[in-house]
Amino acid sequence: MGAVLCTIEEAKDFMREVPENQPFMATSCCPAWSVMAKKLFPQFADYISMALTPMVLTARLQKQKDPDCRIAFIGPCAAKKLEASRRSVRSEVDFVVTFEEIMGMFEAKEVDFTNLPDDPAEAFNDASADGRGFAVSGGVAQAVVNAIHKMDPDREVKVVSAQGLADCRKMMMMAKAGKYNGYLLEGMACPGGCIAGAGTLADPAKSAAMLTKYKAEAPMKNALDNEYKDSLDYLKY
């Protein structure tokens, strides 16, 4: 759900700012990438989208429903620990646990996760295919492009994606040289995207195949088809 909202905000940012007010725009949802870009290329800090990340947007949405709840982010990304502790952005996230860490907890308590019964009430069927695609390299940019084309079918959007911090740095060097004016830049710190994060357990290639299937099962494709699309106005503050 947070990925859906992040998509919409970044799409609107790009349409408003590029190229009228800035030569390019970079995505913001990978904290390791955005921190690196801002530190090594401070002159372009304002060109990285100010959109809140999927983690923060999802947490704020849940807090709206239940202000007293405690929120834990569970995923493959160790850099989310840094993001959740930032004081510049209110994250609403109380705990960040990687897949590797939570598996250690299960093993310590002798919990066999594979044998736990499914609960139909906990099915996640309210996200778009584009939102689910955030976890792989190229997925964020594709979601943003699809949202832009939904709002303005004739809008041309050129995209370049980088995976791994070394390639992300090269991408920013090219942008500095003026090679990517008018582009949407997507950076992913982990080669392959979030599915290959430092705290993951599964083989990234297998995860990518499973994600493709998961996207195909989504009840909608475009982020703008989602019922929560109008939630951004009150979640950003």
Q: Positions of the model-derived regions?
A:
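Iron-sulfur-associated redox domains of electron-transfer enzymes in respiratory
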Residues: 1-237
